[in-house]
Amino acid sequence: MTDRLAGLAAPGHTAIVTQECQGAVIGPNAGLAQLAEEARREALPNITRMLPVARAAGVRVVHCTVQRRPDGLGANHNAKIFAIGRGEVNILPGTPGATVLPELGPEPTDLVLSRWHGVGPMGGTDLDAVLRNLGVSTIVVVGVSLNIAIPNIVMDAVNAAYRVIVPRDAVAGIPTEYGNAIIDNTLSLLATITSTDELLHTWSQHKGTS
């Protein structure tokens, strides 16, 4: 895995995409407390470890967040997921709920893309165009959730001809067993499944050389 991962995740063509790592989703006062607790147990600490090493190696970091107007104008109302937590948290642009968690940045070299609709950033933002402009062909997907958004971005990215890496200890879903089943039975057929430590080892070899 190490040699193959080194080529697949080479900094020159790789970006980390963080998915909904924002206050309203996995912060201390998140709308879905169970998901936030699960994400903060393992995934968030590992993402926090991963990003500085990735940046130092020259890997791009793109944060994908979700935002809504208080009246929901222009946002989806056509699935149950969009009603969960409605009114309990504020994801108005510029609020803590709609902002990347401070422990993750954003740093000056990071990009932040926010969406108004949908369940994933490929269809709801300029993510595809931005990644292509950056020369990215491999995406490392981290964040939440394994229930919906992570499978969505993995499938969309594969359909758009990207190679995808999923560090299994830097993504989260509920219940934990379901998240693991999604990784083992679905995402493993679409993406390279690895760990935070394996990526850190790979990128540490590039530190200061990009």
Spans of features found by a protein language model:
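Short beta-strand segments at enzyme active-site cores
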Residues: 18, 59-66, 71, 167
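Short acidic, Gly/Ser-rich segments with clustered Asp/Glu that frequently serve as metal-coordination loops
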Residues: 22-28
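Short, flexible, mixed-charge acidic loops at enzyme active sites
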Residues: 29-31, 74-80
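Active-site-adjacent betaalpha module
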Residues: 1-15, 52-57, 81-210
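Active-site loop signature of alpha/beta-hydrolase-fold enzymes
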Residues: 24, 69, 173
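N-terminal nucleotide-binding beta1-loop-alpha1 segment
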Residues: 15-21
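Short glycine-enriched, charge-decorated loop/helix-capping segments at active-site entrances
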Residues: 31-40
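A short, N-terminal amphipathic alpha-helix
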Residues: 42-60
